[in-house]
């Protein structure tokens, strides 16, 4: 199968690209720069390059129509302009979906579990939290609507933490916050749970959803259902040799900044349905072990 991947040079996309090629698929990766193109080629020389970015809608349409399937992993990670980034994502998604109408080709849209209702174990049948302000939740629903327009749309939801060597997201940011503050914090009792998955476990799941997934189905790429945030803070404290402390709710935003909505949220997520349907079984180490083994600020 010829597969077009956005975000192919990224933390998750690079693992997915390698997995697909090693499984016999032909991959075309979107590259916004010479650096991204070189990285894709360094991952696997067999990968082909399509130059452009998520704002180049005609390029995205070309990549989609000339492929047998699409995995949309690309996203502009600018948390200071998050709404604008979500709008870029929406337009890119719609452009590709429109170009695939009537083809019945698989289109995998990637969303996060932050848009699910908190304080319960969410499963694949759970819809988007109606109170969610995460704009990507709307794009997930738009993508699913194309199942009635001749596109085999499928959703893959990723947990709060996708971890592994090279991670530049939440855990490293939390470590920098802890170092600057002189303490590794959690909010209140710290019993709120984070779901997690290792980046190398995401790749087989995306391949299975591409090869065996069903139209209109949602899949959860979750290796660990829920890790108490206090445990994450404790391990970070051990690594940095700083005390672990509870941060009062009223002080959470001043301590954690834009991460406050994540560190205060209870978001356990089940992947039982995904595992049963596709036979996916995560093989890599868990988040806490990974932090101990592979995370530092050196």
UniProtKB/Swiss-Prot annotation:
CDD domains, sorted: SDR_a7
Q: Name one GO cellular component term.
A: cytoplasm
Quote the SUPFAM superfamilies the UniProt record gives: NAD(P)-binding Rossmann-fold domains
- Tell me one Pfam family matched here: Epimerase
User: What switches on its expression?
Assistant: Highly induced under sulfur starvation conditions.
User: Which Gene Ontology molecular-function terms are recorded?
Assistant: aldehyde dehydrogenase (NAD+) activity
Recorded hits in InterPro entries, A to Z, give: Epimerase_deHydtase, NAD(P)-bd_dom_sf, NAD(P)-dependent_oxidoreduct
**Domain of life from the UniProt record:** Eukaryota
Q: Would you identify the family this protein belongs to, as annotated?
A: Belongs to the NAD(P)-dependent epimerase/dehydratase family.
Q: What is this protein called?
A: Uncharacterized protein YLL056C
Taxonomy, top ranks, is: Eukaryota, Fungi, Dikarya, Ascomycota, Saccharomycotina
């Amino acid at each position: 199968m010829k597969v077009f991947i956005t975000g192919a040079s990224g933390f998750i996309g690079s693992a997915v690209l390698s997995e697909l090629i090693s499984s016999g698929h032909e991959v075309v990766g979107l590259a916004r720069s010479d650096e991204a193109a070189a990285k894709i080629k360094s991952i696997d020389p067999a990968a082909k390059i399509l130059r452009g970015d998520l704002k180049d809608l005609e390029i995205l349409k070309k990549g989609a129509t000339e492929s047998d399937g699409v995995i949309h992993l690309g996203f502009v990670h600018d948390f200071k302009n998050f709404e604008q980034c979500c709008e870029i994502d929406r337009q890119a998604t719609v452009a590709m979906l429109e170009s695939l109408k009537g083809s019945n080709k698989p289109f995998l849209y990637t969303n996060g579990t932050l848009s699910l209702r908190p304080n319960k174990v969410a499963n694949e049948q759970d819809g988007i939290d109606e109170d969610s302000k995460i704009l990507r939740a709307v794009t997930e629903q738009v993508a699913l609507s194309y199942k009635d327009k001749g596109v085999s749309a499928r959703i893959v939801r990723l947990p709060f933490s996708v971890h592994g060597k090279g991670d530049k997201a939440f855990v490293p940011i939390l470590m920098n916050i802890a170092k600057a503050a002189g303490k590794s914090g959690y909010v209140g009792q710290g019993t709120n749970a984070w779901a997690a998955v290792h980046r190398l476990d995401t790749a087989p799941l995306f391949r299975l959803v591409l090869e065996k997934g069903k139209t209109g189905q949602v899949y959860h790429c979750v290796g660990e259902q829920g890790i108490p945030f206090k445990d994450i803070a404790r391990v970070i404290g051990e690594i940095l040799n700083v005390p672990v402390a509870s941060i009062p709710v009223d002080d959470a935003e001043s301590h954690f900044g834009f991460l406050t909505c994540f560190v205060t949220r209870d978001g356990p997520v089940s992947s039982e349905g995904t595992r049963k349907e596709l036979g996916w079984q995560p093989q890599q180490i868990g988040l806490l072990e990974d932090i101990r083994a592979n995370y530092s600020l050196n």
